Amino acid sequence: MPEITAFPQPKSDLSILLLGAGGREHALAFKLAQSSRVARIVVCPGNGGTALMGGKVSNLALPWGAPPAFRSIVEWAQKENIDLVVPGPEQPLVDGVEGAFKKVGIPVFGPSPAAAMLEGSKSLSKEFMARHNIPTAAFRSFTSTQYEDAVAYIKSKPFTSGRSVIKASGLAAGKGVLIPETDEEAFAALKSVMVDKEFGDAGDEVVVEEYLSGPEISVLAFSDGYTIVPMPAAQDHKRIGEGDTGLNTGGMGAYAPAPIATKEIMERCVKDVLEPTIKGMREDGYPFVGMLFTGFMITADGPRVLEYNVRFGDPETQALMLLLDEQTDLAEVLLACVERRLDSIKLGYKQGYAVSVVLASEGYPGSYPKGLPMTLNPTPEGVEVFHAGTKRSDNVTVTDGGRVLAVCASAPTLRAAVDLAYSGISQISFQGQTFRRDIAYRALSSEPPAEPKGLTYAAAGVSVDAGNDLVEAIKPVVKATRRPGADSDIGGFGGAFDLAKAGYKDPILVSGTDGVGTKLRVALDHGKHNTVGIDLVAMSVNDLIVQGAEPLYFLDYYACSKLDVPVAADVITGIAEGCLQAGCALIGGETAEMPGMYHGDDYDLAGFAVGVVERAQILPTPDIASGDVLLALSSSGPHSNGFSLIRKIVSLSNLSLHDTAPWDKNTSVGDALLTPTKVYIKPLLPGIKSGLYKGMSHITGGGFTENIPRIFSSASNLGVKLDLTSYSLPAIWKWLMRAGNVEAKEMVRTFNCGVGMIIIVAKDKADAALSSLKENGEEAWVIGEVQEKKGVEYVGLDKFGL
């Protein structure tokens, strides 16, 4: 009986060529050797550690390192029937090793020479990110002939953070990034890179980018050009000394997974960066196949790309190889990438953590001795020693580089993995060995105490004591807001209000809720928290007063990841101040401490207000008619709307929140923008109770165009004519128009433009209304009239702001 046709079986005796001589290559050889499909691994040139592995692994002493020399290694690979090439370092990838092997039909786990420019040119990679809307630091690139232009750019104060980072665009052995503290240091850094050529040709182009702050993570991800699969995020330690002090190195240790890389953070890294990167490279015509190693800064606004690398990281790889479980075949994963079928592969990881600690030569990262003999005693179970700068000499392993070894361990907890790695180091010695004793200190410093008697709410990140401290801190200011009908103490299960004591005969309750929007981002970035509480109250109570309602009481909602009592007290003190201005009682609220829901020191606010109005005084009245007069009450500034656009304009103007405001030399940008929303209650209530007003509009997001028509019913044909020449546009709005190139039409449908409240009155009551407002501390003016035409008609729009 003839055999049924079947697909050929995958090759089960693979020969793999590993290019490189470091700890990364030793770790890759270690994991590849576990594959049942791999028969032989040749490491070229390898090191003392790969020389001692035996079994499937051997070294090859064949020179390569520049395109002409690829010929000899390619010819050798052809003769030896190599099935897969895995370059370790970035230089051969940028130099075109993938293309050299591709010509003879040998697949390479690594990007094409063009795709490798993601690492080979920082200027190119930044332009790529900008083109594909991938979040990264603001930047500008310069050629080496534009030194004076680069200096002038820094002098122009282009970044909100006030600091810059100088990067040599080309490959500089991991040393081409300079982080000056001051402008003077930045100028010196530019000179060293662009004029003095400290990094040689790597400095032919320079990137000047904004300094970002926050924790860093490294995400290594496999890609086949379509699918991208990240490994757990790692954190490395670049500085030579404990506490991240001293000179920068290639890396003194790493650990994974990094606790800071929460599920939410990783999802954003994938959705906002990794997937758009792979899609963008494919769209640009350079599909990325290989290892995409992305450095992220976790900022208050989310993950931002620091840099791309196009190969396995060192020393992250050493730790990550220990995390891969026994069922994960690394050779199969690499082949799936080059064969464009990564979506068919599943990577598995051990439960727990892995750590790598680098042992370096004395003097590293400067000059250091070589050829020193080493003592390598047996290490505890669970410890792996990956060689980097070593070689075999007369059957003795000696030092042969700056970073000599990476001692690695995995364990169920990070603390156990760290302790196990350091116990392994105790079995190793060579003259002048240098290593950091604080690897993973960032994560360990936030660990709960060892062997707790039992889990507590505080151990989960919620401090009941902090909540109690906050209640005690705010009790005096809350008590000051009491009014007839509201006498309960804060800290209970809610608030009660006795409506009978408020003195109303035929009351209608009116409620409103609101937040502060992205004005909160300004408060957080500026570090000023005592005014946004006023905004929170104002936004809700001003919505009550336009219905004729007097605010009775207010409740707030304050949410954060970790309660900072002084900050929360500032916010709630502001809320109490807003309540005092509105004449309402702060009778309760909720402070929600929710670890993992918010990032860092971020918090969010919401408010809820309840007011009352006599049935006969509900606004708007049904008798609004054409010819009625519109009165305008000034705003105190942007109030709490339009801040997404305002922040964008400020950013594009290269202003920081601490800079002097261009529209007011007596204050800073941040202080000016945080001027609290005006509370209109007390000036308006007397006129409401006297029956002077027919309707009102609180000018919030949507400006005049969207808010004023809300006074009229949908069945009405009424609208308004607004005379913009009746007042002078305040300086802040003129600056925003000019700096953002915002058209007048956009201004009046986005911002309040200096008018926070519009009142409709009968023409014969206009003078009485103006007098009532003035007597109660509010200057107003006639800004227009009601007409038989829907919408808002503007007079003077063409000259608005000039």
Curated annotation (Swiss-Prot):
Catalytic activity: 2-formamido-N(1)-(5-O-phospho-beta-D-ribosyl)acetamidine + ATP = 5-amino-1-(5-phospho-beta-D-ribosyl)imidazole + ADP + phosphate + H(+); 5-phospho-beta-D-ribosylamine + glycine + ATP = N(1)-(5-phospho-beta-D-ribosyl)glycinamide + ADP + phosphate + H(+)
GO BP annotations listed: 'de novo' IMP biosynthetic process; adenine biosynthetic process
EC category name: ligase
Gene3D superfamilies in the record: 3.40.50.20, ATP-grasp fold, A domain, ATP-grasp fold, B domain, Phosphoribosylglycinamide synthetase, C-terminal domain, PurM-like C-terminal domain, PurM-like, N-terminal domain
Pathway as given in its UniProt record: Purine metabolism; IMP biosynthesis via de novo pathway; 5-amino-1-(5-phospho-D-ribosyl)imidazole from N(2)-formyl-N(1)-(5-phospho-D-ribosyl)glycinamide: step 2/2; Purine metabolism; IMP biosynthesis via de novo pathway; N(1)-(5-phospho-D-ribosyl)glycinamide from 5-phospho-alpha-D-ribose 1-diphosphate: step 2/2
Region (GARS): 1-444
Subcellular localization, as worded in the UniProt entry: Cytoplasm, Cytosol
GO MF terms held by the record: ATP binding; metal ion binding; phosphoribosylamine-glycine ligase activity; phosphoribosylformylglycinamidine cyclo-ligase activity
Keyword Protein transport: no
Summary of the knockout phenotype: Growth auxotrophic for adenine. Avirulent in a mouse inhalation infection model. Does not appear to affect production of the virulence factors melanin, protease, urease, or phospholipase B, or on capsule formation.
Location of region: AIRS: 455-788
SUPFAM superfamilies for this protein: Glutathione synthetase ATP-binding domain-like, PreATP-grasp domain, PurM C-terminal domain-like, PurM N-terminal domain-like, Rudiment single hybrid motif
Residues annotated to bind Mg(2+): 307, 309
Ranges where the ATP-grasp domain occurs: 126-339
Principal location: cytoplasm
GO CC, alphabetical: cytosol
Subunit-structure text: Homodimer.
Family classification: In the N-terminal section; belongs to the GARS family. In the C-terminal section; belongs to the AIR synthase family.
Name listed for the protein in its UniProt record: Bifunctional purine biosynthetic protein ADE5,7
Species, as recorded: Cryptococcus neoformans var. grubii serotype A (strain H99 / ATCC 208821 / CBS 10515 / FGSC 9487) (Filobasidiella neoformans var. grubii)
Record gene name: ADE57
